[in-house]
Amino acid sequence: MRVKGGSVTRQRRKRWLEKAEGSWGTRNTSYRIARQTVIRAAEYAYRDRRNKKRDFRKLWISRINAAVRELGYTYSQFMNALVKANVVTKDGQGLNRKMLSELAINNPEAFNQLVDKVMK
């Protein structure tokens, strides 16, 4: 005798359709397309959680570079001086790029003092 699945199949499909809520067009009504949409969204989310770390690091470096160039130095010269002065260490102790970027934006006077101190 054939078993069609009935309520189990309906529940499973309903779960996929609920995850696709907010999608446009048939992406939230058609089971097959909704399932593909949800799977692809999960792949993008997984990938971009990793890319976000790269993007923010690039942003912080750009901001630090811009702030340091106003004072006549390059980013690489500044970071080298920070490492030699033990302000930034390889094991993550001390100031990191995020902190330096925030300091350059929100408190330029303190950032300028830091640059003057380590570049001597």
Swiss-Prot record:
PROSITE patterns registered for this protein in UniProt: RIBOSOMAL_L20
Function: Binds directly to 23S ribosomal RNA and is necessary for the in vitro assembly process of the 50S ribosomal subunit. It is not involved in the protein synthesizing functions of that subunit.
UniProt keyword annotations, A-Z: Ribonucleoprotein, Ribosomal protein, RNA-binding, rRNA-binding
Family label: Belongs to the bacterial ribosomal protein bL20 family.
GO molecular function, one term: rRNA binding
Stretches that traverse the bilayer: none
Protein name (Swiss-Prot/TrEMBL): Large ribosomal subunit protein bL20
HAMAP family: Ribosomal_bL20 (MF_00382)
Source domain of life: Bacteria
Any one GO biological process: ribosomal large subunit assembly
Keyword Cell inner membrane: no
Gene3D superfamilies xrefs: 6.10.160.10, Ribosomal protein L20
Gene Ontology, cellular component aspect: ribonucleoprotein complex; ribosome
Coiled coil spans: none
